[in-house]
Amino acid sequence: MRSNVHQGHVARKRFGQNFLVDDGIIHGIVSAIDPQPNDIVVEIGPGLGALTDPLLERLPGMQVVELDRDLVERLRRRYGDRLVVHAGDALAFDFGKLREPGRALRIVGNLPYNISSPLLFHLVDFADDVRDQHFMLQKEVVERMVADPGSKSYGRLSIMLQVRYHMEHVLDVPPASFNPPPKVDSAVVRMIPWPRAEDGTLRSPYAACDAGVLGDVVTAAFSQRRKVLRNTLSFLRDQVDFDALGFDLTRRAEEVPVAEYVELARIVGGAEPPARVA
């Protein structure tokens, strides 16, 4: 029987609350995280503690960010000094302030599906502070995050996150693993920020570019997915010599690799185009 009441708490739709109850899935997630005693582990949206409990079996303490005031008080009573509870909205939270020298900052959570994309983009601002992130998300979102060019799932989210993270689709989670069950399948993703070299540049497969410019270019490219780029990127003709760059405008947006979008954003942002090999 479906119910929105679990452990005496009524799941609140406006907070996107679906509580994880499958012990096998919980074990799989904690094993994937593999928390170490010196880690600073921060959980977003701990809910009723389905992940918090097994994480604290391996950690002396951890921190959580929770918006639901009823759950905030419940968590504080239950865990006491072992759990630092930050009451507030993760979309406005400064995760960088939790960083400590010599300790890995790691962020985990079963993210509310109704704010997952904005929250992922908010966390990009703290990628330099974080060792890794493990999140439960709608399966469709995870597939978009890790998608390759040419697939239906490939889009703005794929490009903007792949530029900053190495990502892995870790495991799938069926609706029956939650109470109340969501109407969609879920999945767990691992996100590891590309590290920086001593000079501050990212050690990633992609050249450095302005994230704002890249976002504008990619948003324009995908604004009309069924049309070729000659239509959606025509406004850049005064800034970019597409022929000299070797950028084929007869393609659709989903056919263009991340590296080509990055190079296009670099040129729009003022970088010199690369020399073409004859």
UniProtKB/Swiss-Prot annotation:
EC top class named in words: transferase
InterPro entries per record: KsgA/Erm (IPR001737), rRNA_Ade_diMease-like_C (IPR023165), rRNA_Ade_Mease_Trfase_CS (IPR020596), rRNA_Ade_methylase_Trfase_N (IPR020598), rRNA_adenine_dimethylase (IPR011530), SAM-dependent_MTases_sf (IPR029063)
Compartment list: Cytoplasm
Catalysed reactions listed for this entry: adenosine(1518)/adenosine(1519) in 16S rRNA + 4 S-adenosyl-L-methionine = N(6)-dimethyladenosine(1518)/N(6)-dimethyladenosine(1519) in 16S rRNA + 4 S-adenosyl-L-homocysteine + 4 H(+)
One Pfam short name: RrnaAD
GO molecular function, one term: 16S rRNA (adenine(1518)-N(6)/adenine(1519)-N(6))-dimethyltransferase activity
Keyword terms, alphabetized: Cytoplasm, Methyltransferase, RNA-binding, rRNA processing, S-adenosyl-L-methionine, Transferase
GO cellular component entries: cytosol
Annotated S-adenosyl-L-methionine binding sites: 18, 20, 45, 66, 89, 110
Coiled coil: none
Main location: cytoplasm
Protein family: Belongs to the class I-like SAM-binding methyltransferase superfamily. rRNA adenine N(6)-methyltransferase family. RsmA subfamily.
Reported function: Specifically dimethylates two adjacent adenosines (A1518 and A1519) in the loop of a conserved hairpin near the 3'-end of 16S rRNA in the 30S particle. May play a critical role in biogenesis of 30S subunits.
NCBIfam families: ksgA
Protein name: Ribosomal RNA small subunit methyltransferase A
